[in-house]
Amino acid sequence: MKYKDLRDFLAQLERQGELKRVAVEIDPHLEMTEICDRLLKAGGPAVLFEKSRGHDIPVLGNLFGTPKRVAMGMGQDSVEALREVGKLLAYLKEPDPPKGLKDAWEKLPVLKQVLNMAPKELSRASCQEIVWEGKDVDLGKLPIQTCWPGDAGPLITWGLTVTKGPHKTRQNLGIYRQQVIAPNKVIMRWLAHRGGALDFRDFTLANPGQPYPIAVALGADPATILGAVTPVPDSLSEYQFAGLLRGAKTEIVKCLTHDLQVPASAEIVLEGYIHPDETAVEGPFGDHTGYYNEQETFPVFTIERITMRRDPIYHSTYTGKPPDEPAILGVALNEVFVPLLQKQFTEIVDFYLPPEGCSYRMAVVSMKKQYAGHAKRIMFGVWSFLRQFMYTKFIIVTDDDVNIRDWKEVIWAITTRVDPARDTLIVENTPIDYLDFASPVSGLGGKMGLDATNKWPGETSREWGKPITMDEVVKARVDGMWTDLDL
């Protein structure tokens, strides 16, 4: 099913029992985090806090707290169907040349669909029904959560940050947390390799001393939100990809402050600039690792206007020890990653990011091994293929007889097929998440690969063990008598 905006999505969730309303007054300071954390860990519904203490605006939480709701947001009926999204992305990333006229004809609808998905710019939009400017700009009037007791202050978590580089034709959408430090100022925490930070760097080099335009959209439609966290090919904008998911063009509107374009149906939009050399120390905040992060310096975003729909909804989340909402997103997007990896490495059978691994820090891969040393090739391939995996610290590779989504089987493979000295690959001084305080240097650390495959000649001089399996005829015979055994 497709959704024109966030409210359309919420109405469908409510019809299916996937959204509950809370009429009791709840404090955005800590209380909402505790409620959403309990709901998520129980596989519970999204929640709309209708009365946020001290505010007139309701708060939406736990929206993508189950893989099912992530799939629904992408317009799919099931988590398994997300593989089709991955296949589409794999094709768009590296299109196969047609094998003949028939093949070209079959691929034509996909190509036409992509070409027709350029966003549609509107002259007026619902996200600009109400405008705060000048002294009316006050983030304190928004029910921004303070998530954990040790947090430095309120934190905007689900904002889609819109940026544009000086040499790019398309805009970039990214999700970066933003600490509120004044009624009209937030700290824009983006890592140096992320799209928004790269756009900002290129702009400052090309336009020294000039303020950099920024917009942040809160409460966009689900396809646009999820498009911002999906590995979209560089040749495709997130707005185009959202249009593909939705089956209709993404409607956008030009900001009132500058020329950036934002989702027309967004609930709330922050417009403004990053001024040259204005930075601030960010944090600490509880993060998806389950720890408070170190303080670091990032640019300050000064907000000149806040626009919104009538009766807006504030979309929020928290991050904490997994599982949290980013971890659940990782579980669902895992299915998108599989076809992308299989396109590049046809020997890969399955790929799994355990949610306990903070969304991306550990990966398990099963493969059809073809030669000695093959597992190490896959390790380096995963680390280098997608930007999402450059921070993956641990990769375990198994044969395709192992169900890598069952930890019992993975541990069996590790304990029976791994020699620590031979099968452990250590790579030093590689890019690591800045939030990873276990690394000896901020942003730089080691990676480890475990080869838990059966070993081939050249990898061992010993006769390799043969797994025990029961005769299929005997299994079938016992199946037939099982009911009569009354066991």
From Swiss-Prot:
Cofactor(s) demanded: prenylated FMN; Mn(2+)
Residues holding prenylated FMN: 175-177, 189-191, 194-195
Residues noted as binding Mn(2+) in the record, renumbered to the chain: 172, 238
Domain of life where this protein originates: Bacteria
Primary location class: membrane
Protein function: Catalyzes the decarboxylation of 3-octaprenyl-4-hydroxy benzoate to 2-octaprenylphenol, an intermediate step in ubiquinone biosynthesis.
HAMAP family tied to this protein: UbiD
Subunit architecture: Homohexamer.
Protein name as it appears in the record: 3-octaprenyl-4-hydroxybenzoate carboxy-lyase
Native source species: Nitrosospira multiformis (strain ATCC 25196 / NCIMB 11849 / C 71)
Upper classification of the organism: Bacteria, Pseudomonadati, Pseudomonadota, Betaproteobacteria, Nitrosomonadales
